[in-house]
């Protein structure tokens, strides 16, 4: 929700006369390139999920190999 509001603020600025004008695309792109906390947070979540998947897969395989000799 906050992202949408920030986007609207960037796209439409109101000058003193109350007339809307579009923000320069270079300014907008530079803002979004520098504003990446959500993207970084998502990358961290994905890495944590991948780590959990590898750990569970490794434990499953090790458990399987420990069960085989007892049969």
Swiss-Prot record:
Keywords, alphabetical: Membrane, Transmembrane, Transmembrane helix
Organism: Dictyostelium discoideum (Social amoeba)
Segments traversing the membrane: 53-70
Name the UniProt record assigns to this protein: Putative uncharacterized transmembrane protein DDB_G0281145
Main localization, broad class: membrane
GO CC annotation: membrane
Topological relation to the membrane, as annotated: Single-pass membrane protein
Cellular localisation: Membrane
């Amino acid at each position: 929700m906050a992202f949408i509001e920030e986007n609207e603020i960037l796209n439409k600025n109101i000058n003193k006369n109350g007339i809307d004008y579009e923000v320069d695309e270079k300014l907008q792109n530079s803002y979004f390139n520098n504003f990446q906390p959500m993207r970084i947070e998502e990358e961290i979540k994905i890495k944590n999920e991948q780590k959990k998947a590898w750990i569970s897969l490794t434990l499953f395989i090790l458990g399987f190999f420990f069960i085989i000799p007892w049969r």
